[in-house]
Amino acid sequence: MALGDVYSGVFTESDSLWHQLKTASEAEHDLCWRMPLTDMYLPQISKLNADLVNTGGRPAGACTAAIFLKQFVHGLEDRTKGEEQCVQYAHIDIAGSMEAASNTLNDYQAKGLTGRPVRALVEFARRLAYTS
């Protein structure tokens, strides 16, 4: 919710994936913003009664959700690339952008549930299909 209803938060370690998502989101006026994906949030999801918990409490909720997912994705090999390259991934936080508080965001989106960031993701997939 830190970004309100204007931007979807994107957490990724991959600069190239971030660039692709940002470009697609700008083309569709379905904006996203890169957020910090840092291990500094790891203590918030580490507890005595479990290795990890899927929520770190109210502070930095999107950041702790992203660092939780990183624990399961980070280090996975992308076998399509040969060698040992890690899978590129992004966590997109839509808590704020999934619902518009007013009709002022853009011309095609009314107040209420928005379906965001579907337009950006479809454009991202379309561009990815043409480059593969």
Show the residue positions of the predicted features.
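A generic structural signal for tightly packed, nonpolar segments enriched in small/aliphatic residues
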Residues: 1-132
